[in-house]
Amino acid sequence: MKSFLAPLFSRVEIHQYFRPMKSRMESAYQERLKHRFASLEKKFHLGYNRRIELLDEIFGRENVNIHKYDATEFPGGDVVAHFLSALDLPVEQSALSQSYNEGLSLPAVQLLYVYRKFNPSLTPADRAIVKQLSHMPGDPFRFHSALYHELLANGPNAVFLFEQRVGFSITENLTADDAIGIRSEQDLAEIPQQSLRWLSDTLSRPGGTTVVPPADADLSAVAALVASLHEPG
């Protein structure tokens, strides 16, 4: 990237955002599921500190600006507004992002997980399915702190070295969401009745077909209903 930009500009500045690690891991797992089946056996190598070392080496530390990705610290909760402000550029309403991506709810991730068990590869219908699932209410998707520690592959000093370089903390209250956090793939496969009713209500047509929800143990039938979410109403 530097070799491409250097002839065009006298100076190149880098602005990069980093989430706290547990939040990043939860977001990354959802993204994996959106594209393919993802087990909870594959560890997460987040490599925050190494990434910054590479940026410092290539662009020069004085040209590398690191920001914490935290919507509560952005003007109006908008990352685009924060980025423009960091560049001392006027914030035009038309330039702001239209919505803040909060991710899928826990019930939506559970349904997506079951769908992926039987449809492990990306299909043309997947984007429409994920869009439908994005409207599903419920608790936010969170990892239990024990699962987070199990999946994190970073070295013991990774967070310290990162925070020392960037000047802000990415430390989280790792147990804050343990009451709703998943511990294993078994938790993902336990589809509650409320989620089955949501599937039934979403797929049933007024004056037409009424979809009867399957038994919660019949995961193949649940996956088939999730696959039907791409069909127009």
Task: Place the predicted regions along the sequence by residue.
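Anion-recognition interface
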Residues: M1-G233
